[in-house]
Regions:
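Short arginine-rich
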Residues: 74-77, 83-84
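Short S/T/G/P-rich N-terminal loop/turn motif that feeds into the first structured element of a domain
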Residues: 1-48, 58-66, 82-108
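Conserved hydrophobic/aromatic residues on the N-lobe beta-strands of protein kinase domains
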Residues: 51-52
Length: 108
């Protein structure tokens, strides 16, 4: 698994009405890509945005990164939306979960 951590701050004059359909399309596109696992958006109280995207392999992540619509959305974001952003690509070192039914479960 590969996880992308996308941290961002919007410009004061960000084109928010134009951003909503672009964001919706990026979710639709990412979730239809081979190897897609999940896509989650969060916003902190200080207005920093955080998006987590998971793919099952670096190859599938690369296909997402290079998809023409995603490349165009990145350009739109740099020109019209973001004051700044930072992308971190992660490979999990350890993974485990907890549920009331199963308790703690170690994953790969």
């Amino acid at each position: 698994m590969v996880m992308i951590v996308f941290r961002s701050r919007l410009r004061a004059d960000a084109d928010l009405p134009a951003l909503e359909p672009v964001g919706a399309r990026m979710y639709e596109l990412a979730s239809s890509m081979p190897g897609f696992i999940s896509y989650k958006d969060f916003q902190a109280e200080d207005k920093e945005g955080l998006t987590l995207v998971e793919f099952d392999s670096a190859e599938h992540l690369r296909a997402w990164r290079e998809h023409p619509e995603h490349v165009a959305a990145q350009e739109f974001g740099r020109e019209k939306v973001f004051e700044s952003y930072e992308i971190t690509v992660c490979n999990p070192i350890r993974r485990y979960s907890f549920s009331k039914d199963k308790g703690r479960v170690e994953s790969a």
